[in-house]
Amino acid sequence: MSAREPAGRRRRASTRPRASPVADEPAGDGVGFMGYLRAVFRGDDDSELEALEEMAGDEPPVRRRREGPRARRRRASEAPPTSHRRASRQRPGPDAARSQSVRGRLDDDDEVPRGPPQARQGGYLGPVDARAILGRVGGSRVAPSPLFLEELQYEEDDYPEAVGPEDGGGARSPPKVEVLEGRVPGPELRAAFPLDRLAPQVAVWDESVRSALALGHPAGFYPCPDSAFGLSRVGVMHFASPDNPAVFFRQTLQQGEALAWYITGDGILDLTDRRTKTSPAQAMSFLADAVVRLAINGWVCGTRLHAEARGSDLDDRAAELRRQFASLTALRPVGAAAVPLLSAGGLVSPQSGPDAAVFRSSLGSLLYWPGVRALLDRDCRVAARYAGRMTYLATGALLARFNPDAVRCVLTREAAFLGRVLDVLAVMAEQTVQWLSVVVGARLHPHVHHPAFADVAREELFRALPLGSPAVVGAEHEALGDTAARRLLANSGLNAVLGAAVYALHTALATVTLKYARACGDAHRRRDDAAATRAILAAGLVLQRLLGFADTVVACVTLAAFDGGFTAPEVGTYTPLRYACVLRATQPLYARTTPAKFWADVRAAAEHVDLRPASSAPRAPVSGTADPAFLLKDLEPFPPAPVSGGSVLGPRVRVVDIMSQFRKLLMGDEGAAALRAHVSGRRATGLGGPPRP
């Protein structure tokens, strides 16, 4: 680096050599901490491993006092004779290192460590007793969105008998769960997932109309359309903030919503309903297969996270890092003996074929298909619709404020709130993966009695806590409930819309998980397998959309922090790693979109609808504003109070200070190249080109 470069750039590209968490680590699978991490995250690439290695290396090294020859001789004479042998074992030669490396990793990719007893025992929440949690809650922490409750109140009851063949969403192919073919007999599979009984509960045209109606939404905050719309003006898209940052320029917001629909709902509908003529029943078969694959991956990742490293002891620093991450994760696997169908192998890949690729694409937008939502029952249908609508509005609002060619227009308060949103989304997604892993295990092993299976069927747990988890309400309150967060919400229109989207996902996931618990039946209610299956599939739909929205937030965080130079975005210490683990487990359900790919898609959408970004404000008569104050009123009950005062997210760190972790875990190869170009002083080519003349 040249001495003439400004100090700020030297801080961005530190010349400090990266420290290794374990001394003399061999280049192979390794021993100690890196051997443990490779056992946990072995897969398509080593990005998680490299980032975690830097997490250990970023900690300040232990200071050692320099000793002279006399002091070293005195210390050596005072040491016991066995210390020399112990030291020689700590510094093995190449052959010994290779042998320890082999012993310290799994023999092959299909073998999964069974983990220590504390990882195998316990229920849905791990070692925490759900009954003890219920005793501490005292009251319900589930606070559904008032807008959702209003929509649910006006939703008519299901009328499956009145749905004709022409309204059923197209031809129905025989349902199947590909990953379980040959492993589960047909009758048992149909009992676990009765896909053949999932007939449409309402007419598709009816659900399509209802998705375009949003009670309580003023002009400017449009609901999800059924098809691409031309309400936005073409030409220049102005990104300057209004004088009052609590509102949006109406024209820019409409243009952002047009872009959002083009890359989400319109993209999935164009690829399925219009081009390939895929039926909603095929989408549901894919969803069931993807959820089972996800459950397997969630079990494998959780087991590896809690497994003891074999072949070597960890040093103190590495052991503490491992302990902290294992204690923070929500992935608490059920014992292998209880779920043999989940624990029979290692990580599974996504379903192959063009249809599966389409269903995993478009930022997780499968729930925007009215024919798919029509297959759900009333509560799950409204929950999926509401989550889709609010995340669509939030995506449009983000695209009305963030653009690679107008980064200067982003406000500090907007950049600061993004990290808080990502924190909550990562915890929600991780807890949903854990829930799906447990409920799928319970469905596939109906004769196994396990505390975790009993917990997910415990209605009072899911009435008391969203997703039945104290960690979710803890993360929500920690990120969005303090004074600084409330101030950010009140003083920014974008932050209000983002908060409403998080609240909608909270409401939707709480609704469908409670629906599953009720469908499991009790002494006063019959078991309803079809309703339970619909709840599981609805959770998969909402999780897929949550992941697409989270990738949108990640793209905006990286744009603000790395291309815009903002230091305001902060995240919990383990949020990048937590979200990367979720993305690894959910690959069968969702094809992630890196920031570089996201902005390339946005640029293509802007060219399609003829929009050109500019860092200016619109002039009269198109300078009217839209106020999301109605969402602030909706957010009054959110977030609920936490169950305990402990931290779920860990210490907050600035994104610019952990850019190497962000780059390796969340940005992908193209984003990494863009970041390197930006740090070196050249334009971040992966994040957009100059505006068109």
Curated annotation (Swiss-Prot):
A motif (Nuclear localization signal) lies at residues 63-75. Residues 50-75 are annotated as: RNA-binding. InterPro entries: Herpes_UL47 (IPR005029). Residues 63-75 have a biased composition (Basic residues). Tegument protein that can bind to various RNA transcripts. Plays a role in the attenuation of selective viral and cellular mRNA degradation by modulating the activity of host shutoff RNase UL41/VHS. Also plays a role in the primary envelopment of virions in the perinuclear space, probably by interacting with two nuclear egress proteins UL31 and UL34. Interacts with US3 kinase. Interacts with UL31 and UL34; these interactions seem important for efficient virion nuclear egress. Interacts with UL41/VHS. Belongs to the alphaherpesvirinae HHV-1 UL47 family. This is Tegument protein UL47. It comes from Human herpesvirus 1 (strain 17) (HHV-1).
